[in-house]
């Protein structure tokens, strides 16, 4: 699963979805062989391997698709803008939630997250996406950008909560100390992973940028 996760981005870049299909098929066949011939293997291990490969390897390819769709300087700016939406969502949610938060968003999964912080993060996400609409190669109005900002904000929160659940199931409080108060670097990465493919799907599906792979 880890090997496949590492291979997904270069395979996507070199061979597109045909290569991804071949890699995914190879992964499933390899896991089936391992499950059949290794007596200590469990179904849950097979499922976990597939999940890790798709979540950590396939989903981040969304940024690659977006970058390839908009060549040159503006492609990098577009990807950076999407990332900024995730970062500002996290920062505003943390700052406003810490200062004004009183209503818990998901107390069993992530006790520190609040509805006040959630709303602040969504506003920040919408603001960034409205700025993204101003990038010349992107064909997107402000209403559409606002909707995309909300959806990507939700995707980021979902990825963040999922990572919090993973940590709790593993008995880990924080996934790092690089960013104090934010739960660790993995919180930022998981939000980014979730937003990566969602943003690509929205931009391509909405006809905002051309699909090239």
Segments the model singles out, each with a brief description of its role:
Residues 1-151:
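Membrane-embedded alpha-helical bundles of polytopic integral membrane proteins
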Residues 201-213:
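Juxtamembrane boundary at the C-terminal end of a transmembrane helix
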Residues 129, 193-201:
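Repeat-unit-sized solenoid/scaffold elements
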Residues 141-145, 182-183, 189, 207-209:
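Short, conserved aromatic-histidine micro-motifs
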Residues 49-58, 161-166, 196-199:
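A short, terminal or domain-edge coil/loop segment
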Residues 84-102, 106, 115, 119, ...:
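Acidic (Asp/Glu-rich) catalytic motifs at the cytosolic membrane interface
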């Amino acid at each position: 699963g880890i090997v496949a996760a590492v291979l997904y981005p270069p395979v996507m870049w070199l061979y597109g979805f045909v290569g991804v299909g071949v890699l995914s098929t190879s992964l499933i066949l390899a896991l089936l062989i391992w499950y059949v011939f290794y007596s200590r293997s469990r179904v849950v291990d097979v499922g976990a391997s597939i999940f890790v490969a798709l979540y950590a390897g396939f989903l981040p390819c969304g940024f690659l698709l977006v970058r390839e769709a908009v060549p040159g300087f503006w492609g990098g700016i577009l990807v950076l803008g999407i990332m900024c939406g995730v970062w500002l969502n996290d920062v505003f949610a943390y700052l406003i939630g810490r200062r004004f938060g009183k209503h818990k968003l998901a107390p069993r999964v992530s006790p520190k997250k609040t509805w006040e912080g959630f709303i602040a993060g969504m506003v920040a996400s919408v603001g960034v996406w409205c700025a993204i609409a101003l990038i010349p190669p992107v064909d997107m109005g402000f209403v559409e950008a606002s909707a995309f900002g909300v959806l990507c904000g939700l995707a980021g929160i979902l990825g963040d909560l999922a990572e919090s659940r993973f940590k709790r199931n593993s008995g880990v409080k924080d996934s790092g100390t690089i960013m104090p108060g934010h739960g660790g670097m993995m919180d930022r990465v998981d939000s980014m992973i979730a937003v990566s493919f969602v943003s690509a799907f929205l931009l391509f599906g909405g006809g905002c940028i051309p699909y090239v792979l």
